[in-house]
């Protein structure tokens, strides 16, 4: 996709979140809290939990300027379903590494360093949002991308294992269209990290610092995963013509 886009807009994942940050800045708010329209608050103390720990320091003297909660599904589980992936999804599944990371985060202290962001359960202080914006050109995963943006400028995201919402995602009209967005997303992220890591003054973000999840998605291995998944879905899945077009791009 082209790399143009309005930084603040009502279209595009990153631009919409920047709209929220801009509104908070104009109104002089110290904290911005994000809740998506497909998520449900389960606790009347949601906003109290959102601000828990913000502005404080860890025992190592690291400031907590941004933190993420997590979501549970309809069955009250925070983990990805562990049913064996279909053959056509073998190279695109990320359940095991995500669940490994989630197990660690949930069994740690309440506030721990995060490898991920749940954009619909996310809080950030003015100290961070006044310096770091969401990337308006990202096609999907603007929340995880924001973690990279923060790390590039020397800021961390923290995980609060006592703060969560329920995620009720809508039906997906086309898996192929979503896959194409992910293809653009991961290819863009690789190029972005390469450029940032070679830029003087930027903090380097290495895939190994994101183990067990989402490390492999920020490594060159993702190129093969894209090609193999598209090929498998051309052979075995629905929307074969759409996947063939993606494979041939």
Language-model features and meaning:
Residues 184-249:
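Terminal low-complexity segments of carbohydrate-biosynthetic enzymes
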Residues 1-23, 27:
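Active-site-proximal specificity loops/subdomain of glycosyltransferases
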Residues 61-85:
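Short beta-strand-to-loop element that shapes/binds the nucleotide-sugar donor at the catalytic cleft/hinge
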